[in-house]
């Protein structure tokens, strides 16, 4: 069945483009599991024009927008600089332009984008002989006021097998970790530096969110962090990051779950993903996200012991029909999560009661 689009020439009071869709029509992204292709149009070209210098460079792989007036570009061969992510001023790239770009991408990819449907994924037309780039757009109310965008371009390189030869493979020899019992803070700082995935466990009012913010502050400022939470309580550790907000669907707004946002987060080029709290079906998506190239991620869970935290995660994962037994699910969770930090409150004081490496909890 074809997507039914309702296009308006004006802008609604919310400031979002009025591009809706029939509730009876399936989302092409969720139905087919891939971004919808986008036909080329003069309007799309006009809205992408400020990004043309980077879209036309073969060495550029990522173009990111976190806030108005600037972009972040990952360039393997920049002019006059070192390879990597660079922050660039681009005054034209404001929320209004991103709204219009989202409207165009939605229209010609047969999708919807408005405050009820603030997530949009698509594949842009091919430019300069390159394969089509993938674009992810996230708008309010699923963000902290501003639009977020990521364009990922594939570099097509023809390299011989010999190009991957760096000589004999030497096993990595990391220095020992600090003792978690004697030096818990030094241990955690080193675990964060080494990109260990950390789960914070504790009961109600044990300070899990406050502690999570303290850990976020230890992440190196040059790493890109994507936050996923119900309310904006977490603090981005650096300039290159974005916060996504789950929406419950009240007052005619979007119903966007943490699971939906995790799928979008994977397309926003994160170094680390931080999920405010594991509660249900998003557990499997979080574990898979970590296991597919995002180590060093964090989350929290309600549990009274480190072993109980892994048991809780296994239970929530099994409710998603993961297809594994309880023992297999527990082992999988322990293989993905490196460290469990247990918090408690004694005599009104919150603190760390235990730090456990996950593999010791299921042995």
Task: Please identify what each model-predicted range represents.
Residues 181, 185, 195-201, 214-336, ...:
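Switch/coupling sub-region of P-loop NTPases
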Residues 65-67, 75-77, 124, 139-141, ...:
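Flexible glycine-/small-residue-rich
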Residues 208:
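Conserved lysine of the Walker
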Residues 191, 201-204:
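P-loop (Walker A) phosphate-binding loop of NTP-binding proteins
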Residues 211:
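Hydrophobic positions on the alpha1 helix immediately C-terminal to the Walker A/P-loop
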Residues 81-194:
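P-loop NTP-binding catalytic core
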Residues 1-130:
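N-terminal accessory targeting/assembly segments
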Residues 331-363:
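Conserved P-loop NTPase
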């Amino acid at each position: 069945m074809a997507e039914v689009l309702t296009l308006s020439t004006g802008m609604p009071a919310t400031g979002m483009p009025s591009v809706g869709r029939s509730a009876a029509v399936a989302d092409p992204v969720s139905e087919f599991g891939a971004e919808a292709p986008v036909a080329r149009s003069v309007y799309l070209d006009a809205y992408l024009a400020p990004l043309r210098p980077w879209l036309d460079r073969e060495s550029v792989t990522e173009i990111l927008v976190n806030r108005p007036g600037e972009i972040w570009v990952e360039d393997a061969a920049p002019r006059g600089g070192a390879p990597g992510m660079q922050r660039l001023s681009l005054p034209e790239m404001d929320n209004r332009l991103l709204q219009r770009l989202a409207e165009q991408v939605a229209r010609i990819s047969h999708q919807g984008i408005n405050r009820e449907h603030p997530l949009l994924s698509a594949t842009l037309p091919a430019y300069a002989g390159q394969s089509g780039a993938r674009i992810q757009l996230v708008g309010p109310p699923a963000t902290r006021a501003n639009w977020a965008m990521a364009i990922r371009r594939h570099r097509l390189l023809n390299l011989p097998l010999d190009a991957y030869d760096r000589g004999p493979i030497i096993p990595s020899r990391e220095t020992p970790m600090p003792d978690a019992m004697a030096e818990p803070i030094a241990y955690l700082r080193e675990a964060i530096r080494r990109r260990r995935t950390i789960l914070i466990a504790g009961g109600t009012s044990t300070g899990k969110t406050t502690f999570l913010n303290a850990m976020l502050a230890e992440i190196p400022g040059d790493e890109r962090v994507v936050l996923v939470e119900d309310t904006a309580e977490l603090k981005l550790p650096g300039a290159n990051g974005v916060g996504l907000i789950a929406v419950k669907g009240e007052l005619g707004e979007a119903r966007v779950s943490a699971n939906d946002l995790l799928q979008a987060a994977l397309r926003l080029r994160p170094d680390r993903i931080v999920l405010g709290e594991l509660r249900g079906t998003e557990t499997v998506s979080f574990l898979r996200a970590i296991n597919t190239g995002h180590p060093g991620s964090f989350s929290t869970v309600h549990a009274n012991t480190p072993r109980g935290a892994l048991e809780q995660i296994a239970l929530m994962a099994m409710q998603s029909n993961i297809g594994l037994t309880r023992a297999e699910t527990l082992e999988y969770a322990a293989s993905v999560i490196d460290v469990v930090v247990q918090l408690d409150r004694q005599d009104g004081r919150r603190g760390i009661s235990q730090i456990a490496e996950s593999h010791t909890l299921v042995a």
